[in-house]
Amino acid sequence: MQSSGLLKPRIIDVQSVSPVQAKVVMEPFERGYGHTLGNALRRILLSSMVGYAPTEVGIDGVLHEYSTVDGVQEDVVDILLNLKGVVFKLHNRDVVNLKLVKEGEGAVRAGDIELPHDVEIINPEHVIAHLSPGGKLAMEIKVEKGRGYVPGNVRNLGDAKTIGKLVLDASFSPIRRVAYAVESARVEQRTDLDKLIVDIETNGVVEPEEAIRYAARVLMEQLSVFADLEGTAPVAEASKPAQVDPVLLRPVDDLELTVRSANCLKAENIYYIGDLIQRTENELLKTPNLGRKSLNEIKEVLAARGLTLGMKLENWPPAGLEKA
C-alpha cells in the first residue's frame, strides 16, 4: 500500500506546568486533523483511563447516608463527598479494604487512613471531616480499580452486601481536566496547517505525558481493525526495515523491576521490552523463581506505559538487535 503522503507532526513539545499538569504541542498536521485527533484523544482520556476510587464505606453507628455522627461536625453526606476526593493508588492489587479510626478534636485527613505497604494516598492532607472535643470517627473503606464513572446502583454487589455499608458512585478516572486547542501552523510556504495543543491535568496517579501515550495506544488499537479489512498482507514497496516503537527496543532494566524479577526475565532470554510483552502470563509463571507477586509487578509497570502481556509483534526481533 502506498504512503498517504499526508504530513505527520515533526515537532512535539511537552511543557510541564506542574507534576500533574502539562501542555503537549504537536505540529504540523494537515488541515482538519488537529480537531479530528484532538477530540478523539480527549474523549479517550476522559472515559478510558484506569484509576482507583472508594466504592463502599462502613461508618460505626451509621445505617444510611442521611445520618449524623456524634462529635463530627459534618453529616454523613458531606463525609462521603470528602472521601471521594481522596486519591488512592493501588500497587499489585485491584481491590483493598482500609480502616480509619480517629479520636479527639481536630481534622480527620486522608493521611489518617491505615495503609498496607502496597497502597498509596497521593493527597494525604485532604480533609475528610472535623471532630469536636470527645468526637470519634471510625470507618472501613473499600477501594477498587476501574475506569470511567460507575454509579453505585448499577454495580453488581451480589447478595452478600453487609447491612450498614454505604455504596458510593465511583469516579475512577485519574484525569481531572483535559482540553485541546487547534492553531495555525506553517511549513515553508504552506500556511493552511494545524497545530494541536493538548492541556491535561491529572490527580497524580498517572503522569500527564503517560496518560496521553496511553490514550494514543488505545486509539491505535481500536483503529487497527480497519487497517486489516482486506485480509491480505500489503506488498512491500521496497526492502525498507519495519518501523519499531522505540519503547520496545529499550532493555527490561529500564522498567526498574526488582532485581529478582529482572534476573528471572534474563534467565529466559528476555532482554528487551519487546521480548517481554510477547510472553503470556502462563508462560511467565512457568519461569523458575518468578511468582505471582513478580508477575503483578511486571503487569503494572507495563500498564503504566500502555503495554500488556500477550501482545503480538510482527518482524520481531528487528535486524541488528543484539542480545546481551
Curated annotation (Swiss-Prot):
SMART domains: RPOLD. This is DNA-directed RNA polymerase subunit alpha. Signal peptide: none annotated. Its EC number is 2.7.7.6. The keyword Transmembrane does not apply. Pfam families: RNA_pol_A_bac (PF01000), RNA_pol_A_CTD (PF03118), RNA_pol_L (PF01193). Residues 1-230 are annotated as: Alpha N-terminal domain (alpha-NTD). Homodimer. The RNAP catalytic core consists of 2 alpha, 1 beta, 1 beta' and 1 omega subunit. When a sigma factor is associated with the core the holoenzyme is formed, which can initiate transcription. One of its GO terms (biological process) is DNA-templated transcription. It catalyses: RNA(n) + a ribonucleoside 5'-triphosphate = RNA(n+1) + diphosphate. One of its GO terms (molecular function) is DNA binding. It is an enzyme of class 2 (transferase). InterPro entries: DNA-dir_RNA_pol_insert (IPR011262), DNA-dir_RNA_pol_RpoA/D/Rpb3 (IPR011263), DNA-dir_RpoA (IPR011773), RBP11-like (IPR036603), RNAP_asu_C (IPR011260), RNApol_insert_sf (IPR036643). Keywords: DNA-directed RNA polymerase, Nucleotidyltransferase, Transcription, Transferase. It comes from Dechloromonas aromatica (strain RCB). Residues 244-324 are annotated as: Alpha C-terminal domain (alpha-CTD). The gene is rpoA. Belongs to the RNA polymerase alpha chain family. CDD domains: RNAP_alpha_NTD.
